[in-house]
Amino acid sequence: MTSETRTLYSQLPAIDRLLHDSAFLSLRDRYGHTQVVDLLRRMLDDARDVIRNTQTLPDWYADWAQEAKLRLENAAQSALRPVINLTGTVLHTNLGRALQAQEAVEAVTQAMRAPVTLEYDLDGAGRGHRDRALATLLCRITGAEDACIVNNNAAAVLLMLAATASGKEVVVSRGELVEIGGAFRIPDVMRQAGCTLHEVGTTNRTHAKDYRQAVNENTGLLMKVHTSNYSIEGFTKTVEEAELAEIGRELDIPVVADLGSGSLVDLSQYGLPKEPMPQQLIAAGVSMVSFSGDKLLGGPQAGIIVGKKAMIAQLQSHPLKRALRADKMTLAALEATLRLYLHPEALAEKLPTLRLLTRSEASIREQAQRLQARLAARYGDEFALEVKPCLSQIGSGSLPVDRLPSAAMTFTPHDGRGSRLEALAARWRTLPVPVIGRIYDGRLWLDMRCLEDESRFMEMMLK
């Protein structure tokens, strides 16, 4: 160690002296003595590393309190930070999928703040069932005999298979052996459930006779899987749920369906692409239907299974049900969301997912044009700002081919350097509420479809 290095080490302050500095009093009051001391120890270690590697003091040496304040504030930020989603993907999996309705937020808050009748029967003063209230609502909406709630749709599929077909064959069309995010594959789930996959048909064509010929003494289920995250077009043939249900009745084999996204309303009435609805499959005679709570339904993450009472009872009594059951916050949010469907006239206004999906291109474009001049005054020296037409997508594997006409604010660097776009996007990610767009075709695009808090957005962007 050189004498110069020893001199630099000697200039590092003692923790006790820093703690008695008036600048640290407010930090100790806000974050507590223990947390501040732990941080100062780490800062001293960092300072020693800087001295050892560069033979200089750290650049924050002159103001330890300010550096400590910045580090404490950064550490105190929640890992789940609110962001402004201008990616053009409404149900963005990485950004938490469906926004919750105000009614759902209030229901969750109430469920967290007080004991609730999660598994308590007020009439009989005894134990109740946590799915009961939601099952009643779901049966009213879908026409099913009963319902079961778990923590996501992958869990719903696993439970359906394990509880009703473990040790047996499950017949599925080859064209429906889907994989969703995280390498969740139907064949893998079947193995975990103890089922044997029996593929029928080909990738693009499956006929009714394929299912009939596949049935044997060890067949447990006939299964339909909605290919919600991809589409096969051209020379294709599939067996519709109603026809498969008829085959199931003939052969006395239950038919189950995994809808994936699952919409409880006909989206075509809002000018959106039509998506299969659980109530249609129930009416067609399908024994059980599973779907997600946090996609097109617009609620919290949950797996919902509706169907025949006897089969739902098998699910409720299976050991996996306890491992996969939903908690009180999920159930509270889901119940509040489902109640919105009882008032369909107000659904597009009260359900954020539907409200965002049904925004007209004209209203989005008008919003972008209204903000353009003010943003150009802030960013125009470096970037050319234009309002351009674009196509939003629904996201989360819902309606993968369909796009929604929208409008975006685009930023193109005057000097054509892509690094400026990366730097701008990075700068926006450091805002108090990060703004997330996408870089494409030499521009940074901000699709305005999901921008609702316009004043907050502009306040941050203009700083």
Swiss-Prot record:
Q: Which residues cross the membrane?
A: none
Q: Where in the cell is it found?
A: Cytoplasm
Q: Which GO terms describe its cellular component?
A: cytoplasm
Its principal location?
cytoplasm
Q: In which pathway does it act?
A: Aminoacyl-tRNA biosynthesis; selenocysteinyl-tRNA(Sec) biosynthesis; selenocysteinyl-tRNA(Sec) from L-seryl-tRNA(Sec) (bacterial route): step 1/1
Q: Which reaction does it catalyse?
A: L-seryl-tRNA(Sec) + selenophosphate + H(+) = L-selenocysteinyl-tRNA(Sec) + phosphate
Cofactors? pyridoxal 5'-phosphate
List GO BP terms, alphabetically.
conversion of seryl-tRNAsec to selenocys-tRNAsec; selenocysteine incorporation
State if Cytoplasm is listed as a keyword: yes
Protein name from the UniProt record? L-seryl-tRNA(Sec) selenium transferase
